[in-house]
Amino acid sequence: MSRTPIIAGNWKLNMNPKETVEFVNAVKDQLPDPSKVESVICAPAVDLDALLKAAEGSNLHVGAENCYWENSGAFTGETSPAVLKEMGVQYVIIGHSERRDYFHETDEDINKKAKAIFANGLTPILCCGESLEIREAGKEKEWVVSQIKADLEGLTSEQVSKLVIAYEPIWAIGTGKTASSDQAEEMCKTIRETVKDLYNEETAENVRIQYGGSVKPANIKELMAKPNIDGGLVGGASLVPDSYLALVNYQD
């Protein structure tokens, strides 16, 4: 089973529409063929329109950084997955550690979002990962497995086959500590085994698993050489055209 690698930039709360267009213009002619590597940028909601228009006709795929689990209604400040689909967005990040931590999103919330995203024909990029405290207590696998089980509750094997899961060790984000490629591979393997236990081998072989935790041009090749790592969810390095291009063109 050969899984198409997927490198997704997560811009977080950075970039305005003008900078977005400048970024796309700088990268769009140098992106790999999507059958070789899928290049994605997940941008703030206020930049999505500019991003989609600028990326039109290129190999750049567009993702949102969040959405709500209802398509419409009295939910001030939320983003509709149905409207994201209508706009041409393909991916939505859910369960990011910043959403879990700062906005107190629970696995139940994330599960509802996953169902709504699939119901609207979009693909979730589901984040999971442990804190330093949990890692130091030796409970990281237990923690991540419990997240995956709760987040995938009620999803079909057909849906999970299309899913992207991003492992982000929270302790390796902005702490100066880095997960080694072996540590990253070990957890990505555990995630794949968990999907196999919950569903079946075929589903586990289809699901694409990214590593997210200080991914940069200097370590992308080493990470992508690992059998269970199918891509990267990239923060800071995705904001600069040159480093983003170095990441998506890591095979060259």
From Swiss-Prot:
<feature type="active site" description="Proton acceptor">
    <location>
        <position position="168"/>
    </location>
</feature>
<dbReference type="GO" id="GO:0019563">
    <property type="term" value="P:glycerol catabolic process"/>
</dbReference>
<comment type="pathway">
    <text>Carbohydrate biosynthesis; gluconeogenesis.</text>
</comment>
<comment type="pathway">
    <text>Carbohydrate degradation; glycolysis; D-glyceraldehyde 3-phosphate from glycerone phosphate: step 1/1.</text>
</comment>
<dbReference type="GO" id="GO:0004807">
    <property type="term" value="F:triose-phosphate isomerase activity"/>
</dbReference>
<comment type="function">
    <text>Involved in the gluconeogenesis. Catalyzes stereospecifically the conversion of dihydroxyacetone phosphate (DHAP) to D-glyceraldehyde-3-phosphate (G3P).</text>
</comment>
<dbReference type="GO" id="GO:0005829">
    <property type="term" value="C:cytosol"/>
</dbReference>
<comment type="similarity">
    <text>Belongs to the triosephosphate isomerase family.</text>
</comment>
<dbReference type="GO" id="GO:0006094">
    <property type="term" value="P:gluconeogenesis"/>
</dbReference>
<comment type="function">
    <text>Seems to be capable of enhancing bacteriocin synthesis.</text>
</comment>
<dbReference type="InterPro" id="IPR013785">
    <property type="entry name" value="Aldolase_TIM"/>
</dbReference>
<feature type="binding site">
    <location>
        <begin position="10"/>
        <end position="12"/>
    </location>
    <ligand>
        <name>substrate</name>
    </ligand>
</feature>
<keyword id="KW-0413">Isomerase</keyword>
<keyword id="KW-0963">Cytoplasm</keyword>
<dbReference type="GO" id="GO:0006096">
    <property type="term" value="P:glycolytic process"/>
</dbReference>
<dbReference type="InterPro" id="IPR035990">
    <property type="entry name" value="TIM_sf"/>
</dbReference>
<keyword id="KW-0312">Gluconeogenesis</keyword>
<dbReference type="InterPro" id="IPR000652">
    <property type="entry name" value="Triosephosphate_isomerase"/>
</dbReference>
<feature type="binding site">
    <location>
        <position position="214"/>
    </location>
    <ligand>
        <name>substrate</name>
    </ligand>
</feature>
<feature type="active site" description="Electrophile">
    <location>
        <position position="96"/>
    </location>
</feature>
<dbReference type="GO" id="GO:0046166">
    <property type="term" value="P:glyceraldehyde-3-phosphate biosynthetic process"/>
</dbReference>
<dbReference type="InterPro" id="IPR022896">
    <property type="entry name" value="TrioseP_Isoase_bac/euk"/>
</dbReference>
<dbReference type="Pfam" id="PF00121">
    <property type="entry name" value="TIM"/>
</dbReference>
<comment type="subunit">
    <text>Homodimer.</text>
</comment>
<protein>
    <recommendedName>
        <fullName>Triosephosphate isomerase</fullName>
        <ecNumber>5.3.1.1</ecNumber>
    </recommendedName>
</protein>
<dbReference type="InterPro" id="IPR020861">
    <property type="entry name" value="Triosephosphate_isomerase_AS"/>
</dbReference>
<feature type="binding site">
    <location>
        <position position="174"/>
    </location>
    <ligand>
        <name>substrate</name>
    </ligand>
</feature>
<feature type="binding site">
    <location>
        <begin position="235"/>
        <end position="236"/>
    </location>
    <ligand>
        <name>substrate</name>
    </ligand>
</feature>
<keyword id="KW-0324">Glycolysis</keyword>
